[in-house]
């Protein structure tokens, strides 16, 4: 018996050689069905969940734990209770820590802080005498970071690697009746140096705990390898079964589709294959099944069979069965491309952390299904388990629903210097190998897994080479990818860079990131390129995403990538007023933190979607539509089906014809396009074109019937095509109305319509339009003013670490130029009456640091009918950096909380100049609240581009502009750190932009806005026409 004091003295949690003690060898998940039919149907598994309320107490360090807590008779009545699974930091113990790169403790591997929060758990399990006739194994699917286990006061063993199962044989420790389990979990261990992923540091038993009952003679492991013949028609299944039984026992394998057997039973014994010059295995059975023309598994067609593996004694009596879903598919790299079933894949992927806003790292099945359905609804076909093996159920669901998986080992040493320090250290080789091999051994039977990953951001060293070599020997059916060390080392079958650009080199003397187009053309480089991370979706981001997809579709060896990342890692918190907000790094008093750098998702923590997800859905669409030919009476469309393995047998094309953004004709067409092919469709048009009207054809590809992941009617792909107007031009009408009345009263310039219905008043000293009344009702609450500032986006701030601010970041450059702090002076303000209008001209100079930074001239042309034509001329100093925006801001009255905003332009969702591929021109209406995107870290949001007409309240504006509306002042948005810091104002801020800089998004730590979306010109001119909406 190992004494508690000996365990404390031994300090397994600071020894990289002590990865696990007394753990059973890793294997595919086991269920121990006692009947073949039960195995086939997946019912009555011999697994007992130990999830529930456990006794719990947190200590400051292992040395402070009372070793008597391991004993069955220990009095835990005063202890708290905590749910298992859970993270203890989310139940009032200790605090969450978020860091991207930095370790939250002093770096001195393998040692960890002496102040090492230690959670002690206790629970009781009752077993009958009949239960003890079988072996009893306990399985911890995930414990962070390391733990010791006792049963009835006896030490059982130790394990670390928080993302893989730890399984112990409890049989010899159990008694009939009540049994006591005690677990001591350390927050930090030497393994923490290998788990420096960009996520929350949370602790505890956070995945399921299960008791597995198996007979004395049983199946220990099953390794299934599907294959297809050279024509990808017929299938074979290699089955390698490891047993704990006499050599005379037999293994039977049989394949089912539903309840129907599709192969005959195949029965064999150990010693049936010679391995080397010393002979055969005495506990391994090799078998092969063949199936003619099986239904193939792909993400598009996730056809599954079920393999039942049974152990029979020498008399043929059934003892136990295990069963696994089987997907017939073949993964290979040939001709420089990653292929599935002979077809080159295009990876529409995303990196996904296991994150829940209330449960932390605990994921329920419902959460997993919701993520998968959202991914498929938004045209993702692949997921990278960033950066660790996921919950076992995740892979079963990916098999079932259809997602390609890049399964990643729980290894990241991002905070080491150099990053490869541990990766090149032989003392850590065992820890590396254990993490990788146990992942592969657990997950090897899942058809959804098409790529193994050696880990993330750990440099490149001999330990990676060892993992790669083992993988290629153990499972040659799957490629291996790894980004570290430059993305193209000998330890990867796929060039797998992070954040490489399409056309721009990111220079680094150690690990240069070539433009992806160039990378595949480097000398002697024949591998496919799949970005393991790209398009950093932090806040208001994903600019120029369409540029990647144009490259992916143009160059066959550019095979897509995995967006970073899926979900904002915000944790639910409430302020002192009971207002909810999403917390990020530093919000829990965690002094080492990287603030909001964990808020990188395409969706919010509660799974509502960001506008960026619309852009991803559009660019990744599986079915594209393009206009091939147009006459006055018809349009010919080319429909391309990028699905590689299924025809459009459950889709229809709904179309609508728009005139000036309004629908005037609709229709539907049956859609029948074979996989990976094209067809032409003709749409008959029945309308008379109007002079100078704009016409667009919208197409929506919709599901006819519901699928497992989306309801009937779900739109899988959209398109909008501009049509030519076959009508002639309209003759313009000339104004014949008299000019309005101009008067001056001291410093006031007053312009009124002859019927006194419309009135404008300027202050000639400030040059500002102070009042605009219609029928005595104020149209504005504050004067329109030049607007050059935007509340900085995460990409503008450009940091990945709190103490690593880049002076070249946009926000730093803007602050240096004083943008948002300029002092305005009116140079002059003039007015004159013309034949039909009154013109008021004001000139402003903007000063900062003793210099004039900008000069603007506003020319207001006022008509008797209440119309105001505003012409703005902007000149900027040559010394200024690219500007955030060129435009103006007004403040309007707020009459109702759900004020409708109607516009003719791109929408309906938020779009920016470099993120508008998915937006469509039309006449849109949304409420004021819908026009604001509540980014967790408040920033500029809600822009709509390509606008020609806008109505807010009783004011209509026309021109060619971009706009946003909000109840928050820009300074509020710039200063707020969370949404609960924002107090909605009793007014509407209307921002009208002539030009607005792009949002960027190739990454979030460098100025990533592409040149064509930067405002580098020094002269701008624009016009806006204002009029009462009632006209």
Curated annotation (Swiss-Prot):
Binds 2 magnesium ions per monomer. Binds 1 sodium ion per monomer. It catalyses: Hydrolysis of terminal non-reducing beta-D-galactose residues in beta-D-galactosides. One of its GO terms (molecular function) is beta-galactosidase activity. It comes from Vibrio vulnificus (strain YJ016). Na(+) binds at residues 198, 597, 600. This is Beta-galactosidase. Mg(2+) 1 binds at residues 412, 414, 457. Mg(2+) 2 binds at residue 593. Keywords: Glycosidase, Hydrolase, Magnesium, Metal-binding, Sodium. Homotetramer. GO terms for biological process: lactose catabolic process. The record marks 353, 387 as: Transition state stabilizer. One of its GO terms (cellular component) is beta-galactosidase complex. The active site is at 457 (proton donor), 533 (nucleophile). Its EC number is 3.2.1.23. Pfam families: Bgal_small_N, Glyco_hydro_2, Glyco_hydro_2_C, Glyco_hydro_2_N, LacZ_4. HAMAP family: Beta_gal. Belongs to the glycosyl hydrolase 2 family. InterPro entries: B-gal_small/dom_5, Bact_Beta-galactosidase, Beta-gal/glucu_dom_sf, Gal_mutarotase_sf_dom, Galactose-bd-like_sf, GH-type_carb-bd, Glyco_hydro_2, Glyco_hydro_2_AS. Substrate binds at residues 100, 198, 457, 533-536, 600, 1005. Its cofactor is Mg(2+); Na(+).
